[in-house]
A protein has these predicted regions:
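Ser/Thr-rich, low-complexity intrinsically disordered terminal regions
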Residues: 1-119
């Protein structure tokens, strides 16, 4: 399983709404925004080892870029694990941690957009 994660999802919502939902998802999951470009619908956040009361074991950096896609928007999410001094972890990462954070982030983003949750 790769340590880095890349996912793209298309939503039938405008880019501004998707970006705002991403900000709320970051806040809900306890992430800290380290950079953002609201005019370009882009953010980068760092997440702690423990999220929603569950200890995952690694810090994670996640970036989300939203682009217009026809009548909706495309959310592009990239994430990777961080070491103790917040550098990209190149080896020794726990399997599944980064994927879990990306999955939770997208689930919260979709909830904030008012979309039904997947079964």
């Amino acid at each position: 399983m790769p340590f880095e994660q890349h996912q793209e999802k298309i939503y039938a919502k405008d880019p501004q709404s998707i970006y705002e939902a991403a900000l709320k998802a970051t806040e809900k999951l306890g992430g800290k925004i380290v950079s953002s470009a609201p005019d370009q619908y882009r953010l980068t956040a760092r997440f702690p080892k423990a999220i929603l009361g569950k200890t995952l074991g690694e810090r994670t950096e996640l970036s989300c870029q939203v682009r217009a896609d026809g009548t909706g928007g495309l959310a592009v999410v990239d994430a990777f694990p961080l070491d103790a001094v917040e550098r990209k972890l190149m080896f020794g990462a726990r399997p599944g941690v980064t994927l879990t954070i990306v999955t939770w982030f997208l689930a919260h983003l979709e909830h904030n957009l008012g979309l039904p949750s997947a079964p």
